């Protein structure tokens, strides 16, 4: 029985990892073993940060909405505003509210007035 060396498969696998590690510092971009470790760690960071990005944007939207609500009425807080929106039956998500607060303050103030009226 003849010996199978599988050199092409190994070379292709190595080349794939080295290609993914392109631009990394020093041996991390050329040495297969360190490149494998670097690519694995980079993939871990990428997966973690895709999840974190969603949390970070939601926190940013909440901060922007809170700031705009306090400009509208110093007594109103973010939680009271959201409660007023739900009582008024206004279903607008936080992303849209934050965008309105930044780019169209008049429209946001109209929504805030409706929320305040629903609370009273």
UniProtKB/Swiss-Prot annotation:
Pfam families recorded: Ribosomal_L20
GO biological process: ribosomal large subunit assembly; translation
GO molecular function, one term: structural constituent of ribosome
UniProt xrefs under InterPro entries: Ribosomal_bL20 (IPR005813), RIBOSOMAL_L20_CS (IPR049946), Ribosomal_protein_bL20_C (IPR035566)
Domain of life: Bacteria
PROSITE patterns: RIBOSOMAL_L20
Residues annotated as signal peptide: none
GO annotation, cellular component aspect: ribonucleoprotein complex; ribosome
Keywords assigned: Ribonucleoprotein, Ribosomal protein, RNA-binding, rRNA-binding
Record-stated family: Belongs to the bacterial ribosomal protein bL20 family.
HAMAP family (alphabetical): Ribosomal_bL20 (MF_00382)
Main function: Binds directly to 23S ribosomal RNA and is necessary for the in vitro assembly process of the 50S ribosomal subunit. It is not involved in the protein synthesizing functions of that subunit.
Protein name stated in the entry: Large ribosomal subunit protein bL20
């Amino acid at each position: 029985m003849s010996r199978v060396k599988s050199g092409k498969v190994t070379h292709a696998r190595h080349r794939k990892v080295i290609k993914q590690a392109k631009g990394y510092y020093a041996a991390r971009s050329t040495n297969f073993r360190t490149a494998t470790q670097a690519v694995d760690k980079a993939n871990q960071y990428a997966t973690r940060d895709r999840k974190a990005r969603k949390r970070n944007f939601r926190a940013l939207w909440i901060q922007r909405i809170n700031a705009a609500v306090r400009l509208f009425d110093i007594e109103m807080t973010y939680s009271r505003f959201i409660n007023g929106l739900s009582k008024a039956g206004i279903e607008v998500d936080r992303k849209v509210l934050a965008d309105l607060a930044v780019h169209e303050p008049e429209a946001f103030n109209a929504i805030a007035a409706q929320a305040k009226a629903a609370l009273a």
